[in-house]
């Protein structure tokens, strides 16, 4: 489950081409978290993890500080987090997460992307059941780590899958367990390199190379929109990427 998500994420980062898009997305998340839970990372767990994620992505410290200050400034932009769901070409389910200061503009734009690329925007919540909403934690791997023991240790706190990467361990849990997992990892002294929320499809749909090209054009167009934070889909990855 998780490995395919990591491949999708890597391809998305490659499509974005430069870090400016990543910084914009993270900046919005940081501002929203600081507005909701306060600007102090010591008392705001969500902000704390986002700042750590920004560090991993090499986001400049001044960008992070500016995003936090934006939450308490008189010029604060009131972002609303809205989800849009629809079907792309060939029945591929697409779930779009946005953070916008103008929902009328955003929904009109997203609908136009679907329409122009052979898809259709559905009603809110209509496709949510096709995806598992997960929290993902990347923790720094230590030489003496026993993965089997670690998995048994973490299962009581909501972790339901664990994967080993080159320099880190990737943990997956249900979205609702995010706070429990983060608190335990921090209290137990694990170093969290980054964390994020994802939607992983329950099942994936096979497509031809030509169909894939058409679907990816729609996904790329949606991702280019500045209001869009994440795009998830249930198209099966190409051979060798599962």
UniProtKB/Swiss-Prot annotation:
Q: Where in the cell is it found?
A: Cytoplasm
* Sample GO molecular function, one term: DNA binding
Its GO CC terms are: cytosol
**UniProt cross-references to Gene3D superfamilies, sorted A to Z:** 1.10.10.200, 3.30.70.980
Q: Which domain of life is it from?
A: Bacteria
Q: Name one Pfam family in it.
A: Transcrip_reg
| InterPro entries in the record | Integrase-like_N, TACO1_YebC-like_2nd/3rd_dom, TACO1_YebC_N, Transcrip_reg_TACO1-like, Transcrip_reg_TACO1-like_dom3, YebC-like
Major place of residence: cytoplasm
Q: Which organism is it from?
A: Porphyromonas gingivalis (strain ATCC BAA-308 / W83)
The UniProt family comment states: Belongs to the TACO1 family.
Write out the entry's keywords from A to Z.
Cytoplasm, DNA-binding, Transcription, Transcription regulation
Q: Which GO terms describe its biological process?
A: regulation of DNA-templated transcription
Name listed for the protein in its UniProt record: Probable transcriptional regulatory protein PG_0097
């Amino acid at each position: 489950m998780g490995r395919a998500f990591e491949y999708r994420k890597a391809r998305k980062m490659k499509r974005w081409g430069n870090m400016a898009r990543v910084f914009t997305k993270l900046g919005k998340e940081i501002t929203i978290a600081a507005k909701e839970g306060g600007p102090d990372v010591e008392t705001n767990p969500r902000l704390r993890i986002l700042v750590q994620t920004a560090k991993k992505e090499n986001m400049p410290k001044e960008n992070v500080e500016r995003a936090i200050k934006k939450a308490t400034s008189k010029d604060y932009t009131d972002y609303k987090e809205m989800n849009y769901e629809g079907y792309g070409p060939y029945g591929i389910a697409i779930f779009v997460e946005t953070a916008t200061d103008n929902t009328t503009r955003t929904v009109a734009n997203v609908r136009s992307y679907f329409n122009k690329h052979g898809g259709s925007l559905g009603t809110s919540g209509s496709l949510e059941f096709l995806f598992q909403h997960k929290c993902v934690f990347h923790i720094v791997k230590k030489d003496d780590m026993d993965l089997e023991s670690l998995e048994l240790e973490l299962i009581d706190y909501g972790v339901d899958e664990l994967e080993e990467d080159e320099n880190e361990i990737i943990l997956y849990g249900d979205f609702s367990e995010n706070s429990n997992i983060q608190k335990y990892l921090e209290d137990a002294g694990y170093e969290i390199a980054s964390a994020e929320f994802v939607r992983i499809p329950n099942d994936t749909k096979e497509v031809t190379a030509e169909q894939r090209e058409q679907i990816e054009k729609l996904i790329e167009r949606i991702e280019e929109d500045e209001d869009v934070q994440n795009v998830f889909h249930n198209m099966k990855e190409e051979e060798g990427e599962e």
